[in-house]
A protein has these predicted regions:
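Conserved catalytic cysteine-centered active-site region
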Residues: 67-121, 151, 162-167, 233-259, ...
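Active-site pocket-shaping loop/turn-to-helix segments
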Residues: 24-50, 69-71, 94-108, 120, ...
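Phosphate/pyrophosphate-binding loops at sites that engage ATP/ADP/AMP, CoA/4′-phosphopantetheine
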Residues: 48-61, 175-180, 275-279, 308-323, ...
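Active-site pocket-lining segment
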Residues: 171-173, 209, 217, 287-356
């Protein structure tokens, strides 16, 4: 792991506040949002965040948006989303690809520009439409004879370890063996995630973070999608009977892994000066953040490396954090990192996680920040921590404070 400097953000020249944090619902694969391009989902999230914050589009200094599966999306996806949300064409935009951590890294980059004094107000988040990801054909030189092989863009650019050529699920199997996490453990974790997600939706705990998406239809009125779709697409009693997906003797199944999804999320970041100047209302403050990396095959436990760095920068320990959001790329990821970090499972992903809600790659890192802010508000809590792994062996983490 690389060396790091323990510097608290609040001791720097700029404090970074979050003045809005929203997301679209997450659509099931080939579901209700499958026809809405990632950049349109991003635009909807950005527009919703701007409206929620009261920030006028012309006040935004820069935009960072995560997007992983970019083939066919078109040039400069972040700019497409920004312009679609009504931002001026003079606002610089950058698209970030750190696989599943893209959305969180976008927020980190946005915060850094504010701390450096380059910006006062930044839009940051992520977006993905996995349903629209194309298949690839290597036909540049033509095919003289024989069949043409097509590659799945989702697998090629999102779910395959580029070094060992094995799927992410194979890495998850190795993690389960290393930490003695059984199939039953993972199935129970998944069932808990689904139950928590359903209970949270029934109690209206997700309502405050959602920006509905109006989906045009060939005939008739548009259909408005205002709820996550994935958590209802399950029969809990069938989970224990599913076959392993990556190893016939393995423990990872379609049910205890996250799903393929479509969605976007966006946060509005502002300096203390901007908050005071424009009369903005902070909902959270960024206390610290960190990245970490290790062997790509062990991306599954990389959050357990990034989280301690973020905590050290904040001058905190795990005991100082009231609630956590850890990405549930697989149930084993949540279980392993909770175990390694010594966290209380009752304080982690309390409203369900990606196994039940969905995991649109470019949005996942910023989505858990959106949810974490709302969890802190719902429980009148102060400190929240978030961690997310990413393919290639990396992870990002962030500590926030409720305002």
């Amino acid at each position: 792991m690389s060396k790091f400097v323990l510097v608290k953000i609040e001791t720097m020249s700029k404090e970074v506040y979050i003045v809005a944090a929203v997301r679209t619902p997450m659509g099931a694969f080939m579901g209700g949002l499958s026809t809405v391009p990632a950049t349109e989902l991003g635009a909807i999230a950005i527009k919703g965040a701007l409206e929620r914050s009261g920030v006028k589009p012309e006040l935004v200094n820069e935009v960072f948006m995560g997007n992983v599966l970019q083939a066919g999306v078109g040039q400069a996806p972040a700019a497409q989303a920004a312009l679609g949300a009504g931002l001026p064409n003079t606002v610089p935009c950058t698209t970030v690809n750190k696989v599943c951590a893209s959305g969180m890294k976008s927020v980190m980059l946005g915060a850094q520009t504010i701390i450096a004094g380059d910006n006062e107000i930044v839009v940051a988040g992520g977006m993905e439409n996995m349903s629209l990801t194309p298949h690839y054909v290597d036909g540049r030189n033509g095919t003289k004879f024989g069949n043409i092989t097509m590659l799945d863009g989702i697998t090629k650019d999102g779910l395959l370890d580029v070094y060992s050529k094995v799927p992410m699920g194979t890495c998850a199997e190795a993690c389960a063996k290393e930490y003695n996490i059984t199939r039953e453990d993972q199935d129970n974790f998944a069932i808990t995630s689904y139950k928590r997600a359903a209970a949270a939706w029934d109690a209206g705990k997700y309502d405050n973070e959602i920006v509905p998406v109006s989906v045009p239809q060939r005939k008739g009125d548009p259909i408005v999608i205002s709820k996550d779709e994935e958590y209802t697409n399950v029969h809990l009693d069938k989970i224990p009977g599913l076959r392993p997906a990556f190893d016939k003797e393995g423990t990872i199944t379609a049910a205890n892994a996250s799903t393929l999804n479509d969605g976007a999320s966006a946060l509005i970041l502002a300096s203390k000066e901007a908050v005071e100047k424009h009369g903005l209302k902070p909902i959270a403050k960024i206390v610290s953040y960190a990245d970490a990396a290790q062997d790509p095959l062990w991306f599954t436990t990389a959050p357990s490396k990034a989280v301690p760095i973020a905590l050290a920068k904040a001058g905190m320990t795990t005991k100082d954090v009231d609630f956590w959001e850890l990405n549930q790329a697989f149930s084993v990821v949540g279980l392993a990192n909770t175990q390694i970090l010594g966290l209380d499972p009752e304080k982690v992903d309390v409203n369900g996680g990606a196994v039940a809600l969905g995991h649109p790659l470019g949005s996942s890192g910023s989505r858990i920040l959106v949810t974490l802010i709302n969890v802190l508000k719902q429980n009148n809590a102060k400190i929240g921590g978030a961690g997310i792994c990413n393919g290639g062996g990396g992870a990002s983490a962030m500590i926030i404070e409720n305002c």
